[in-house]
Amino acid sequence: MNTPEKTVPSRTYRIAVLPGDGIGKEVMPEGLRVTQAAAQRFGITLECHTFEWASCDYYAEHGKMMPDDWKAQLSGMDAIFFGAVGWPATVPDHVSLWGSLLKFRREFDQYINLRPVRLFEGVPCPLAGRKPGDIDYYVVRENTEGEYTSLGGVMYEGTDREIVIQESVYSRHGANRLLKFAFDLAQSRPKKHVTLATKSNGIAISMPWWDKRADEVAKDYPEITLDKQHIDILTARFVLQPGRFDVVAATNLFGDI
């Protein structure tokens, strides 16, 4: 007796495609090809909509990175597939970034920047003696606050007394949700280990506060091991001992590094 094949219900997602600048324009066609192949394999339909703004070419023509109704245009999408932003020969980097990508992150509250680090079969590794399976960890970067703010200013500009102030902003809400995401991720993995990227020996107010927040969140995850490492030695150990890491939780700047 033949049994009917099970069919996977098709799902349709609307994807905003923004190639942006430079390498973004080069890699986006191949990125879409891979994404469409994966979608076909898993019974997903992607409805892609390409937007030519959020680029320095658009800025050169319009004096801004995006149209005024950019958020309305993107709000109906399920995801944003973004290439790259920046062309400093024509637009200062802080103008292009704050005029596009950072707006996406803040306006849509994209508070997790998840960065997988994994060595695949067939990919040469610059680290001696490493093989697939030896390197497999995540960096969980806070994506909406922290060191990347526009709070501050310049005083006495152009004089010998010139002062520059730029402030970092951390909230209990922002730190807790980042840390909980990291611990939940670690809970789903065999090593069950979270490393906090910190610098509490030199940044004497905000980083000890982050250490404390991690200790508090860790109380709800007794099966997870937590350790804290200063960002300078942490980056060195990523190269020297990459296999020791599982999930790394980091502020906006440290996660970017």
Question: What do these predicted regions represent?
Answer:
Residues 61-64, 204-213, 239-246:
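Short glycine/threonine-rich loop-to-helix capping motif typified by GTGT followed
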Residues 43-68, 236-238:
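N-terminal beta-loop-helix "entrance" segment that forms/cooperates
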Residues 21-24, 78, 140, 182, ...:
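Buried hydrophobic positions in well-ordered alpha/beta secondary-structure cores of metabolic enzymes
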